[in-house]
Amino acid sequence: MKLAEALPSQRVLRIGLLAAGVVAVVATLALGGWFWYRSQESRGLVALAEASNLAQQAQGPGATVEARERAIKALEAVVSGYPRLSAGGQAAYQLGNLRYAAGQYPAARGAYEVALAKGVSGTVRTLAAVGIGYTWESENRYDRASAAYEAAARSTGSKDFLYEESLMDLARTQELGGKPSAALDTYKRLLKEVPGTRRGSEIQSRVASLQSRPAK
């Protein structure tokens, strides 16, 4: 065989061997990455369990400020140390609750937003959205609180108890924000969309009070 004829076949062989080597390396890296991820996930879940236990103790009767700070630091470590943790959103939500209880409203809001960004779903998602509203309301930012409560109501259905709570929160902040007409509309909406509401008498009382106010 002439040299010119042999070169193409040798190149094909080398390319094939190189490709096989690359595939083997990629497979090894992928396997190693999977094991690393599983290891990180396991450690993260253990850390979250420990932090959640501290959080539960910090929210119990007779809990001290020091206990709450320990729980906050533990949850902060989980959120920052395990950014890919499957339950990272749950950790951020718990962190938001503790920060809110400590009066750290901007920090609590940030934690709730992280929980939403990490894809928490169902009840926790709605609670995180409501939590954002609570932080704005605590700062007397009623327009922003109303927007957060309305977003929370949109994230659930009328048969969910959190839908009712979100609309009640919305109406309250509308009243506090000097928008009685909007609050009245929200209360009426709640009576229409949740006719069997357990808070019917309370809502009717608010409706009567708002309707009795002199028009401005």
Please identify what each model-predicted range represents:
Residues 1-25:
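N-terminal positive-inside, membrane-proximal cytosolic segments immediately preceding the first
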Residues 79-88, 102, 116-125, 153-162, ...:
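Short solvent-exposed coil/turn linkers within tandem alpha-helical repeat scaffolds
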